[in-house]
Regions:
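Hydrophobic residues within well-ordered, non-membrane alpha-helices that form the packing/core
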Residues: 30, 34, 41, 101, ...
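Active-site-proximal, well-structured secondary-structure segments within enzyme catalytic domains
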Residues: 129, 133, 162-165, 172, ...
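N-terminal helix-rich structural modules
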Residues: 1-200, 215
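Short His/Asp/Glu-rich catalytic/ion-coordination signatures at enzyme active sites or charged loops
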Residues: 10-25, 74-93, 115-158, 215-257, ...
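Intrinsically disordered, low-complexity regions enriched in Ser/Pro/Gly/Gln/His and often acidic
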Residues: 2, 94, 236, 325-327, ...
Length: 425
């Protein structure tokens, strides 16, 4: 069996050949890529020449080309169009990749070269960008355990591997609950729901091969229109609770035990690295620098934010009472009555605004903004392989010169994790 990862990519612009890549290709591709990467790392770590920015940092930047290619394609598929084969590979590879990178970060000779450069950075004559790269490499190695000694190093490596597995299981559990949940609905259930949301619900029922004319899932794009527009309060409550319970249901996908173990291991990892808590470790290289600084910001914001939230709650409760409701405002009521209040105060109905935000118009607006700000032009390409029929590809250019490809994947589906996010190849 030929493996696309071992052959030149002949699609336009050497784009990933998604039409040829199969799940069975990843295991041998990972195996070869990891071996090649370790050989490259070994050569740098054991270079007899004194460490320089070029033979250490620049050399590291140039390693792992095949691994980067395999990883970028795989993780895009795992997030965008997964299946049981991809999930099995993801779960298997999570600790393997954690062990691989931990081994690199704890490579004594390699870190000694990086540390030597860091200690002498003022004598290297580097520009600001190169100094930043050196600093980031050094910090990443230290935060990954390069300075941990003795038994602590072995324990830290084990923790990192285990956390990788737990994190993967956590995400897969949430997606599994999202894939499993579907709520069939009749026309009467959708009173108040605008046509655009009804059309999406009808498409969901068709995709799930249901007898019911409509259906909703716990994907955000399915939930939010129901919470904002459905007159049926019982439906809003049922869907809201299902949405917020993903990964917390009494089934095989419950994340409670995973969370407890993750919290314990994160705390232990932080202490092995010399930090008081995981929060101190996590924030040390962020703008806040410490949990104390982050907490101060939250406390400064808390009082006015809470005051405003209570004002909004009281205003919404008045709408509930004024429209004949004899109940206390709950979480599944908030969007619905906020929509009514918006219409009452500003004569603004979101369902009437939605047609002005059609996908094609939003794509056109985004591309126009990119052109005005950065001089970028976008031309759709139909000859570039994609991983799902929903995906569209545009060639990006500036003043006639090729810049890259932009893949747009705009629709929710059961094989795709929720949210707004991006990846790169």
């Amino acid at each position: 069996m030929t493996n696309p990862f071992f052959e030149p990519w002949t699609a336009p612009f050497e784009a990933p050949p998604f039409d040829k890549i199969k799940p069975d290709h990843f295991a041998p591709a990972y195996d070869r890529a990891l071996k090649e990467h370790l050989a490259e790392i070994h050569a740098i770590a054991n270079d007899p020449a004194a460490p320089t920015f070029e033979n250490t940092i620049v050399a590291l930047e140039d390693t792992g080309r095949l691994l980067n290619k395999v990883e970028s394609v795989f993780h895009n598929l795992a997030s965008s169009h997964t299946n049981e084969h991809i999930e099995a590979i993801e779960l298997h590879m999570a600790p393997v990749m954690a062990k691989h990178w931990t081994g690199i970060h704890m490579n004594g000779p390699l870190f000694a070269r990086i540390d030597s450069l860091k200690q002498n950075e003022g004598k290297l004559g580097l520009d600001a960008e190169s100094l930043r790269v050196l600093d980031r490499y050094w910090l990443d190695f230290v935060r990954a355990g390069a300075k941990v000694q003795g038994a602590g190093k072995e324990r830290l490596a084990h923790i990192v591997e285990r956390l990788a597995t737990l994190g993967t299981e956590f995400g897969q559990n949430v997606l599994a609950d999202e894939q499993a949940y579907v709520l069939p609905l009749a026309e009467a259930d959708l009173a108040g729901v605008p046509d655009f949301a009804k059309e999406a619900a009808a498409e969901t029922a068709k995709d799930r091969k249901l007898d019911a004319p409509f259906a909703v899932t716990t994907s955000r794009s399915s939930v939010e229109p129901i919470l904002a527009f459905a007159d049926n309060r019982d439906l809003r409550e049922k869907l809201f609770k299902a949405w917020t319970a993903r990964g917390d249901n009494p089934n095989d996908h419950n994340n409670a035990a995973l969370i407890q173990e993750m919290v314990r291991l994160r705390a232990e990892r932080a202490k092995l690295l010399g930090y008081k808590t995981f929060a101190h470790f996590k924030l040390a290289d962020k703008m806040a620098k410490s949990p104390e600084a982050a907490r101060k910001l939250l406390e400064d914001v808390w009082a006015p934010a809470r005051r405003r939230a209570l004002e909004e709650r009281d205003a919404l409760q008045k709408v509930v009472t004024g429209t004949g409701g004899n109940f206390k405002l709950e979480a599944w009521d908030w969007r619905y009555y906020a929509e009514k209040l918006r219409k009452e105060r500003y004569d603004l109905d979101e369902s009437e605004v939605m047609p002005y935000f059609q996908l094609e118009k939003m794509i056109e607006a985004a591309f126009d903004t990119a052109h005005r700000l950065f001089g970028l032009d976008f031309a759709e390409r139909k000859d570039v392989p994609v991983y799902h029929p929903d995906v569209r590809v545009w060639e990006v250019s500036r003043k006639g010169r090729h810049v890259g490809l932009f893949y747009g994947d705009y629709f929710a589906r059961s094989s795709k994790r929720g949210g707004a996010w991006m990846s790169s190849f």
